[in-house]
Amino acid sequence: VPLPPSTWRRLGVDGHDVGGSPVLPAAGWLCLLATAASDAPVGLRRARFLRGVRDAGAPLVLSLDRGRAAVEAGAETCATCLYAGAALVELATCAPTCTYVLDEAGKALHYRRCASVGLRYSAAFECVERVRWFADRSFSVDVRAGTVAALLDAPLQAVCALDALRGATFVPVGVERCELRDAARAPAFAVATGRLTAATDAALACDIALRTRDGTLVATLQGARFARVADARPGAGPGG
């Protein structure tokens, strides 16, 4: 299934960049892979983001084979997943257990932190209203998103910028299980809750649940994994 160059515009990811050059975000890959599902809710397993695509005009192809989906750019595979039934059950790891706030950032501070480690977002993806980190390594994110890709990306942004004070840039590299109630429409307001399940200097992992204002579960990301990348801060590196 050919994906037209307008795909990036439709997902609202024009201008999304890491280290100064545009790149299709992890949430964009999840949405592209979800488009192949015929049932709702959508269940994706073992999603892997293998290679970044930095050319918004690059021809992408979505291929399906016995429950496996892949997005390809030319001869290279960029993202893969398996399909599975979706139950949208509550993730125990995302249940709030602590009320002691260690850190809190409003929208302006959050995006300054992102920019300080080379993470810049188009207007559609500037959807984080507030981020709170708690003493038990859990977090919450208030989200106002116009697209499903932005909705999914909001809590990922919070984790990517977690270590901004040390100048560390993290990017998503995979999700063990992603479930979406509706892959086509995003609620106007949502709250993401999550918890770090692993953290080292080189990698992070977490579970995330997204709910509407009335508490309806709309998406879960279980086993989201992040890797630290080479210094992407503005002006970093030789001659920077």
Label the predicted regions.
Residues 1-240:
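Acyl-thioester-processing domains in fatty-acid/polyketide/NRPS systems
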